[in-house]
Amino acid sequence: MSTATLDEARAAARSAGLAAGLRRVLARSTAVPCSAGGRAFLPAGWSGNVPAWHLPGGTLPRADARVRRHLHPLAGTCDLELVEVSPLVCTAVAPHDGPDFCPADELALLGVRIGTAERALDQATEHLAGRTSGGAPMIRYQLPRAAIADAVTELELCAAYRSCPADAHDRLCGVEQSIAGLFGGSGYLCAGPATSLYMAALVASTWTPVNGPGRWS
């Protein structure tokens, strides 16, 4: 199966945002993973393009799936939608009945999160350059500059974790929180400048296994 690479997804997310990065991954994916409850975040309007849904235990073809859209307070600000997927009939999803979510796609999702974080870091740098303290732009002070440098280093380390993307996804959570803090109080607002960071983490929580193989969020 052809899939977007980490670098391709990273570049798409950094240049055009979280939804653009996800579109790059999903355009060549055979199945979209869902959480244990059958929920997934997708680019708005994308659910009709999904060929199959990967639920814990097996894969559900589009023709056999019921897809419901749910309102989410933050998804729309990032051009995303929340869907809930279930079988059309009350039967168990047979294991190994279709293509699983490719490990390369999990790696590409890592690229989406890194690119989204880099985009937010670029915005945070501009934010600090436009604010003054003691008559000087905040970007000139040691603490903000050190925080930015640390974030850049951490993001490159996450990108280097290609053999273990699950560990990189865990590590990214701390980096995203650090970047959000660079915006000051606005970084903690709903629909604020750091919303894409929170949404990227939510997407990953439904797309990637947690607490070991076979266990999903």
Predicted feature locations:
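Glycine-rich beta->alpha junctions and the first turn(s) of the following alpha-helix
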Residues: 32, 41, 47-52, 56-153
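Glycine-rich phosphate/cofactor-binding loops in nucleotide/flavin-utilizing enzymes
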Residues: 1-38, 50, 87, 183-217
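Short, well-ordered helical secondary-structure segments
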Residues: 5, 97-99, 170, 176
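Short, charged low-complexity intrinsically disordered segments located at boundaries
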Residues: 149-158, 205-210
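C-terminal helix-coil-helix/basic helical segment that borders enzyme active sites and/or dimer interfaces
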Residues: 136, 152-191
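Short, conserved alpha-helical segments within structured domains
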Residues: 140, 144-147, 168-171, 194
